[in-house]
């Protein structure tokens, strides 16, 4: 069998990198020639993780076929618009994910492992256990980081009942204190001062097709929402430019306070009435407070989907 690429979504976060790194390692242990690659450079949080566990960043690829690869495994995503550029021209043989299934179709049967847990890394951990393969320290560290990132250290409503035990076991294998390491990791991802507005709105952004509309939903983590809002003018300029160049109908930016577990929603586009209806708030100067919201997957995208489909 020729080489298989394993990768997470575009604009990769710690779970996209961690789950693909871990699953590629597991596949190699099971005799498959698999390489973890990335669809973008690591963000600051993930760079902290890679440095902490002395792991080289996976190489960034633009397409699979240009690398002579025709079979791929997706982790932490399944929607084609979030995947590699030539996704429709290669064979997807496996998916390991914890998101909704949408805009996904294959010509052949495949293995899909979908679970409503806190992270794709949580699923990969279970697959190690099921195959009786030991998890080395670096893999444990990256899987743990993916889980911490996606659940905001187990505080997000996306946290599954099984996730705390998974986190404790991975922390033990990685040789770290869960709380101390988790907080340091999350804080590393809140350093936004060096980011341009264009970079800031693309750190962690995904496009969703909602009733024929291409809606971009981005998220940045911070310890002070006002710091981000102080740059509102340049952020809005970057958003409007992105809307125009990419054909988005709307752009929603979640500015998430990781210490107090709240978000400010900044929204621009042609369907702001639907965005207001989704969250039962009124945008003032294009933004509004959303108490208790920290999860794009559970507290933003489903609400937008329902509102746009009415």
Curated annotation (Swiss-Prot):
Mn(2+) 2 binds at residues 15, 76, 98, 150. Its EC number is 3.6.1.1. One of its GO terms (cellular component) is cytoplasm. Mn(2+) 1 binds at residues 9, 13, 76. This is Probable manganese-dependent inorganic pyrophosphatase. It catalyses: diphosphate + H2O = 2 phosphate + H(+). Keywords: Cytoplasm, Hydrolase, Manganese, Metal-binding. It comes from the Bacteria. It is found in: Cytoplasm. It is an enzyme of class 3 (hydrolase). The keyword Manganese applies. It holds the Pfam family DHHA2. PANTHER family: BIFUNCTIONAL OLIGORIBONUCLEASE AND PAP PHOSPHATASE NRNA. One of its GO terms (molecular function) is manganese ion binding. The lineage of its organism: Bacteria, Bacillati, Bacillota, Bacilli, Lactobacillales. Its main location: cytoplasm. Belongs to the PPase class C family. It comes from Streptococcus thermophilus (strain ATCC BAA-250 / LMG 18311). Binds 2 manganese ions per subunit. SMART domains: DHHA2 (SM01131).
């Amino acid at each position: 069998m020729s080489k298989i690429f394993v990768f997470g979504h575009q604009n990769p976060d710690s779970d996209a990198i961690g789950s693909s790194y871990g699953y590629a390692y597991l596949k190699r242990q099971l005799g498959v020639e698999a390489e973890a690659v990335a669809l973008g450079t690591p963000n600051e949080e993930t760079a902290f993780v890679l440095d902490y566990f002395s792991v080289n960043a996976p190489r960034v690829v633009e397409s699979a076929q240009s690398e002579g690869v025709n079979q791929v495994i997706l982790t932490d995503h399944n929607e084609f618009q979030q995947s590699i550029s030539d996704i429709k021209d290669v064979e997807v043989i496996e998916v390991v994910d914890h998101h909704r299934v949408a805009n996904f179709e294959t010509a052949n049967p495949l293995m899909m492992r979908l679970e409503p847990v806190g992270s794709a890394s949580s699923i990969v951990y279970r697959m190690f256990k099921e195959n009786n393969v030991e998890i080395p320290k670096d893999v444990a560290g990256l899987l743990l980081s993916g889980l911490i990132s996606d659940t905001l250290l187990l505080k997000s409503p996306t946290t599954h009942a099984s996730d705390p035990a998974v986190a404790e076991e991975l922390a033990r294998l990685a040789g770290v204190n869960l709380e101390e390491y988790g907080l340091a990791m999350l804080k590393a991802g809140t350093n936004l001062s060096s980011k341009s507005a264009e970079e800031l709105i693309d750190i962690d952004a995904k496009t969703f097709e909602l009733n024929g509309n291409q809606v971009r939903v981005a998220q940045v983590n911070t310890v002070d929402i006002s710091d981000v809002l102080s740059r509102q003018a340049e952020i809005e300029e970057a958003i409007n430019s992105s809307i125009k160049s990419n054909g988005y109908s709307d752009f929603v930016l979640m500015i998430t306070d990781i210490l107090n577990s709240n978000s400010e929603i900044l929204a621009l586009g042609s369907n702001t009435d639907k965005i207001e209806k989704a969250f039962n708030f009124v945008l003032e100067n294009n933004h509004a407070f959303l108490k208790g919201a920290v999860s794009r997957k559970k507290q933003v995208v489903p609400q937008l989907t329902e509102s746009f489909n009415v």
